[in-house]
């Protein structure tokens, strides 16, 4: 780095191993100067956005270019397991990212996964953790934590001021069920009942080995991150294989492959919002123990637990990266490398809105929405490098690059209305 004029910062595998995170992108926050990391939401598996040295455009994306094992990627780093990453290099300015042209105008994030480089022996490594998440701060609402009389006093004063003393005898002031619950001191803390402790678990196993001629690596990873509201969750399975064969000291070849399978449950719309609006004097349960749809007849907000059961938002994503290379070094300091890499990713987003939801009001027939996208990207790079140093003072480093890239993107959307009551978004496949 001392020979570079551009701004480059790196995060190594050793640094990554010390951090506990479900999204590799979050490891850059606060550790790389000039890099801002923002999550779109706190739901498990939510997207993460990176800005390098601030906002460059008000009309277009400010996302940097991601290059994973030599292949420009559209998917960011969410599908990667931090245990599989060798290094992350962030190129911040125009001089350091010039090789990528206009695509690198917002900076470049280069991710290199672990490959086969061990020449002797055999090692098996395991890393993992299990953790719990709990809400650290729940807003103090009027009448929460069993203090329902505080809400009753507030509501009484509000109605007197707005409608007069006579309004307290109106049936829409307090329902018979609310009066019964107040009489017996039965109050419901909606936010605390809807929130829950959540489990996060991650396990990674890797094996490396080799001889003088052959090196290999293999890894498996599993991550499950549950949310603190409803059935929100993120699940990821990863696998990687690397092989390198050395014909001689001058000539070698190798392959690297990476596969990631991701499933995200984004939970229900409106459930948490509804919990903020419902008073502690109403219950989510009917007398027979089943869930009520309208907990309070005078409110437009439905039972959040019913919303969770009847509104599904799910995403299924797959990612595959395969690369093969040949490298030849005819003389000391001069090397030629040819690499071809193929990346394929697909994602399917589906949403189901049942009859018993806030949007349908318990009256209209269910509807479903499905969005699907597929990306195929291949790159062929041919690189000639000459590196020579004279008397430990003068250094010459020259690089010649010829690259060919092709991208193919396909997508579709569909929506279905009036679907059977007990179906889901898979009904419109």
Task: Please identify what each model-predicted range represents.
Residues 2, 118-186, 197, 227-234, ...:
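Surface-exposed loop/interface segments of Gram-negative outer-membrane beta-barrel transport/assembly proteins
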């Amino acid at each position: 780095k001392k020979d570079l004029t551009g701004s480059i910062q790196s995060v190594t595998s050793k640094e990554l191993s010390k951090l506990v995170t479900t999204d590799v992108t979050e490891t850059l926050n606060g550790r790389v100067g000039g890099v801002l990391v923002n999550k779109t939401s706190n739901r498990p598996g939510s997207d993460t956005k990176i800005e390098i040295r601030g906002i460059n455009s008000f009309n277009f994306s400010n996302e940097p270019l991601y290059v994973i094992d030599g292949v420009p990627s559209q998917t960011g780093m969410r599908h990667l397991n931090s245990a599989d990453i060798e290094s992350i290099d962030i190129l911040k300015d125009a001089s350091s990212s010039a090789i990528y042209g206009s695509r690198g105008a917002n900076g470049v994030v280069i991710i290199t996964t672990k490959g086969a480089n061990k020449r002797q022996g055999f090692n098996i490594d395991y890393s993992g953790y299990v953790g719990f998440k709990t809400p650290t701060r729940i807003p103090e609402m009027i009448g929460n934590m069993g203090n329902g009389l505080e809400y009753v006093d507030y509501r009484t004063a509000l109605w007197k001021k707005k409608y007069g003393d006579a309004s307290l005898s109106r049936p829409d002031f307090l329902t018979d069920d609310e009066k019964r619950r107040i009489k017996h001191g039965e109050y419901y803390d909606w936010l605390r009942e809807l929130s829950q402790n959540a489990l996060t678990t991650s396990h990674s196993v890797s094996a490396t080995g080799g001889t003088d001629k052959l090196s290999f690596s293999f890894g498996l990873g599993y991550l499950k991150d549950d949310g603190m509201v409803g059935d929100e969750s993120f699940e990821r399975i990863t696998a990687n294989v690397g092989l390198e064969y050395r014909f001689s000291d001058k000539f070698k070849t190798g392959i690297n492959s990476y596969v990631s399978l991701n499933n995200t449950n984004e939970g229900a719309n409106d459930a948490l919002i509804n919990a903020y609006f419902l008073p502690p004097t109403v219950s989510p349960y009917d007398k027979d123990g089943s869930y009520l749809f309208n907990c309070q007849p005078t409110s437009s907000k439905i039972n959040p637990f019913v919303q969770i059961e009847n509104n599904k938002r799910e995403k299924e994503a797959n990612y595959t990266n395969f690369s093969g290379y040949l490298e030849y070094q005819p003389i000391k300091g001069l090397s030629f490398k040819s690499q071809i890499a193929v990346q394929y990713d697909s994602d399917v987003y589906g949403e189901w809105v049942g009859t018993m939801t806030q949007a349908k009001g318990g009256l209209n027939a269910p509807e479903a929405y499905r969005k699907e996208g597929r990306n195929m990207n291949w790159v062929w790079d041919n690189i000639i490098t000459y590196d020579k140093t004279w008397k430990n003072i003068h250094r010459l480093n020259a690089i010649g690059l010829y690259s060919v890239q092709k991208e193919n993107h396909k997508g579709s959307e569909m929506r279905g209305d009036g679907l059977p009551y007990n179906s889901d978004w898979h009904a419109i496949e």
